[in-house]
Each structure stands twice: as structure tokens, then as C-alpha cells.
């Protein structure tokens, strides 16, 4: 990463949640220092309740670190902004809006002309494979289709960094596998700096350029970093894939 542009940098980020008027303090993150280069697909992996979602929310500007700082293109992150797009585990679509309406919402709020925003939204509807569903409402869509809308909406707003918080955690195994394939395909077509959070090592190896693991207890601390030098598209049954997955599983003591 020596000659590559650093897009996101976390410097000694720590987070303590306070309860009962500050009488109870819960340390969630401790001394997280991390750099993500432009167009890198970074996956943060760890078990539940290890602080990885909190770290993503701090990068998004939705949480403030207790100590430390986050920088985007060298500028300190002080709150949410259009330069970061986020896809959540729970579906966050507007139920009264169609697929087209949901995807173009951010562009509309930004004052973009209708013709232009429809053109952009249409491009991403096509990219995520939802042609023919432009006029469908969220209640008419499957879970996988809803997340495709969420991903298309995030891409349509053209953020500098895309943040995904266990976006496939609520999907069945088959749909989750298909969405992993779609995510890898879309990223290959529309290169973007991506930070993806998951508790699945298998998913991490399939998607990542680099994997960062967090310890499985609070406060979350960085444990290891792995560069994934496997060709794309990847196959879960390839020898090299299985060897890397096994190595990470053994070294992090996480169960698949």
C-alpha cells in the first residue's frame, strides 16, 4: 500500500458507552488504528458483540469516538456526510416509495434534475438486476431484493466510501450466497472503497482484498490483518480459498 492513496484512516480510535448517568462505563473499542486505501475492499470480521459495528458507525460519523480520530481524504470526520454511503443489516427502505423512488431519493434531495436522477437510478437498477421492478414497493420484494435496492441507492449517491454492516445477516443461506456474488460483481464493475463488516470468515475471504479481524471480546481490538491474493471471481471450494479460510479460522479461534 506504499504508493496507494489512503482513503480512510482511523487513529487510535476508542469508544466507551456510558449508562446510568455515566456511573456504568462499557469499553467497546480500544486503540483501533487502521488505514484503507482507495478502491480497496476491506472486510472487518469478528464474532457478535466485538465492536465491529460500532467502528463502522464511527467511520460513518453516526457515533463519536471517545478518543482518537477518523480521517477521510486527510480531513477529520466529525459527522455523517454524503461522502459515505451506508447499507445496514436491517432494511432501511422507505415503504411508501417504489424501487425507483428509493434509489433516486438522495439525488432528489440534492436537487438533481428528474431526468438525470432517473438515468442514474436506472443504471444502478440494471446493475443490481432489478429491471422490471422499478415500480414495485418494498413489501413486494424479497429480502435479497430489498438489499439490492439498498446497495443500488448507496452507489447511486456516488459516495467516496461505501460502508456495509452485515448486510446479508438476515438472509437465508442460498440468498446470502447469491448476494455475495452480486456484491463482488458490482464492486468489480464500479470500483469503490468498501468497508464491509461480517461475522463470517467464509464471506470475508470471498469478498475481500484484505481482512482485518477483531478480538472476540470487549473492548474490541485489532488482532490480525490478511491480504487476500486470490483471483476473482472466487470459488468457495477452491483449494487456496479453503486453506486461507482454515488459516484465519484457526488463528482467530472463530467458528464458521
What are the residue ranges of the model-derived segments?
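The feature captures the beta-strand-to-loop junction immediately N-terminal to the Walker
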Residues: 45-47
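Helix-to-loop junction immediately C-terminal to a conserved catalytic motif
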Residues: 60
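Conserved signature/switch motifs of ABC ATPase nucleotide-binding domains
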Residues: 136-139, 157
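Hydrophobic anchor residue at the start of the ABC signature
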Residues: 151
Amino acid at each position: 500500500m506504499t504508493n496507494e492513496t489512503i482513503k480512510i484512516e482511523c487513529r487510535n480510535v476508542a469508544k466507551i458507552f456510558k449508562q446510568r448517568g455515566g456511573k456504568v462505563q462499557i469499553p467497546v473499542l480500544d486503540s483501533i488504528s487502521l488505514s484503507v486505501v482507495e478502491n480497496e475492499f476491506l472486510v472487518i470480521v469478528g464474532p457478535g458483540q466485538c465492536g465491529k459495528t460500532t467502528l463502522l458507525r464511527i467511520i460513518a460519523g453516526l457515533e463519536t469516538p471517545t478518543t482518537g480520530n477518523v480521517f477521510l481524504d486527510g480531513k477529520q470526520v466529525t459527522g455523517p456526510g454524503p461522502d459515505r454511503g451506508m447499507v445496514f443489516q436491517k432494511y432501511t427502505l422507505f415503504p411508501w416509495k417504489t424501487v425507483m423512488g428509493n434509489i433516486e431519493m438522495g439525488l432528489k434531495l440534492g436537487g438533481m434534475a428528474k431526468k438525470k436522477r432517473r438515468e442514474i437510478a436506472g443504471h444502478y437498477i440494471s446493475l443490481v438486476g432489478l429491471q422490471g421492478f422499478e415500480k414495485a414497493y418494498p413489501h413486494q420484494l424479497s429480502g435479497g431484493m430489498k438489499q439490492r435496492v439498498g446497495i443500488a441507492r448507496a452507489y447511486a449517491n456516488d459516495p467516496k466510501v461505501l460502508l456495509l454492516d452485515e448486510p446479508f445477516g438476515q438472509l437465508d443461506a442460498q440468498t446470502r450466497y447469491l448476494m455475495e456474488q452480486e456484491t463482488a460483481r458490482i464492486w468489480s464493475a464500479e470500483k469503490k472503497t468498501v468497508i464491509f463488516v461480517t461475522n463470517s470468515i467464509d464471506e470475508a475471504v470471498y469478498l475481500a482484498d484484505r481482512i482485518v479481524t477483531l478480538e472476540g471480546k470487549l473492548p474490541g481490538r485489532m488482532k490480525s490483518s490478511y491480504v487476500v491474493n486470490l483471483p476473482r471471481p472466487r470459488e468457495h471450494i477452491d483449494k487456496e480459498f479453503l486453506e486461507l479460510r482454515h488459516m484465519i479460522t484457526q488463528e482467530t479461534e472463530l467458528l464458521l
